Amino acid sequence: MSSQTAPRRRVTIHELRRMKDAGEKIAVVTAYDATAARLADAAGVDVVLVGDSLGMVVQGHESTLPVTLEHMIYHSAAVRRGLARSSGRAHLVGDMPFGSYQASADEAVKSAMRLVAEGGVESVKLEGGAEFVEVIRRIARAGVPVMGHIGLTPQAVHRMGGYVVQGKDSEKAQQLLRDARALELAGCYAIVLECIPAELARIISSQLRIPTIGIGAGLHCDGQVLVLNDLLGMDDAFTPKFVKRFGEIGQAISTAVGAYVGEVKRRVFPDDAHSFHSSTVRLVPAAPVDEDDGEPSGGVMGAPV
């Protein structure tokens, strides 16, 4: 019997469905660059999402609205390269940003196909409920799997009046359940449930055949998603209720950079261990360049031979 570890099964949309049926929880991480993707994949995440949240986390905007399709393609391609440097097991999903699918189904299909062809994603995610059923059908018919996203949908932040929990009353909860069913019938292979009551998320998850991925939606979703920067504790100022910090990397980074600055200022870094040396290099006089004619005009030590 071989002592080598068998390769982990590549996560596909069919594998995610199998995981739901088997009661196996799905771990999703949002990442934006090659290094983060490589580390997340090596840690065993099932899905890496390149989220349009990069507008806030990476670009420093107040919302996701300024993010363009070009931005999403750029970051998706970087994440794809990172996954290629690891096991490449994780399924890669790319967000469809604001303005890339709302205008028409034709535009949506083109946007989705670009994310696949140029960004290297295996599926796309879009926000919205039953009003996007035809868009989802068209994208799916074009051969691109679609992950839905209901509840708090950040691209609709102005309509929602801010980043607030959705579905807290019976009428709105019923609408979210209808939306979830409509997205499943339209062809979504999974749905993100963001910032809705845990009780509602449990009902939706139990009534759908496709996996639900929760963020701020309680324990009973089929999977969970967090932004890598958030779960690592990169930003002390961002502390939403649904984020658990599994590390305090932000403080560790500040400490490490502070130590670097201190050693530079004290002339401690770089030491011999971090410098290159040669016993054969010697310098001979080199004439400086005359400012008038550009010709050497005197002796200056500095030309290696």
UniProtKB/Swiss-Prot annotation:
Homodecamer; pentamer of dimers. Pathway: Cofactor biosynthesis; (R)-pantothenate biosynthesis; (R)-pantoate from 3-methyl-2-oxobutanoate: step 1/2. Its EC number is 2.1.2.11. It comes from the Bacteria. It is an enzyme of class 2 (transferase). Binds 1 Mg(2+) ion per subunit. Belongs to the PanB family. The active site is at E194 (proton acceptor). PANTHER family: 3-METHYL-2-OXOBUTANOATE HYDROXYMETHYLTRANSFERASE. Keywords: Cytoplasm, Magnesium, Metal-binding, Pantothenate biosynthesis, Transferase. GO terms for biological process: pantothenate biosynthetic process. InterPro entries: Pantoate_hydroxy_MeTrfase, Pyrv/PenolPyrv_kinase-like_dom, Pyrv_kinase-like_dom_sf. It is found in: Cytoplasm. This is 3-methyl-2-oxobutanoate hydroxymethyltransferase. It catalyses: 3-methyl-2-oxobutanoate + (6R)-5,10-methylene-5,6,7,8-tetrahydrofolate + H2O = 2-dehydropantoate + (6S)-5,6,7,8-tetrahydrofolate. It comes from Anaeromyxobacter sp. (strain Fw109-5). Its cofactor is Mg(2+). GO terms for molecular function: 3-methyl-2-oxobutanoate hydroxymethyltransferase activity; magnesium ion binding. 3-methyl-2-oxobutanoate binds at D52, S53, D95, K125. Pfam families: Pantoate_transf (PF02548). Catalyzes the reversible reaction in which hydroxymethyl group from 5,10-methylenetetrahydrofolate is transferred onto alpha-ketoisovalerate to form ketopantoate.
